[in-house]
Amino acid sequence: QGFYKVQRHLGRAAHVAYLGTLAVAPQAKGSGLARRMMQDALDRLAASGIRRVELSVEADNPRAIAFYQRFGFVHEGTQRAAYKRAGEDGYVDELMYGLLLEA
């Protein structure tokens, strides 16, 4: 009903992970599954020594932005005109968010 994908950085940024995807099936929306998955991901990352989690979200996705902010993610920058959606004329801004985990 859902999955998440995390990529851990290497070298001097080995304390950082990028949360690339967190997705739930349409029928699971509103069930709390995404919240449980996010908490599971953050707990596992913290237990493995990760101290910083990064993610990006489309600027026109207020539901996802609010979701990430509820977990304490902070807006750290905007990548303007980051990409173009298929079949659309305009470009999409990508918002960069970060979260520092407890040591």
Identify what each model region corresponds to.
Residues 1-27, 38-40, 44, 100-103:
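Acetyl-CoA-dependent GNAT
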Residues 25-27, 31, 59-60:
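Active-site acidic-Proline motif in GNAT/NAT acetyltransferases
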Residues 45-56:
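Conserved GNAT acetyl-CoA-binding A-motif
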Residues 54-57, 69, 74-90:
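Conserved catalytic-core motifs of GNAT/GCN5-like acyltransferases
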Residues 87-103:
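Terminal substrate-recognition subdomain of acyl/acetyltransferases
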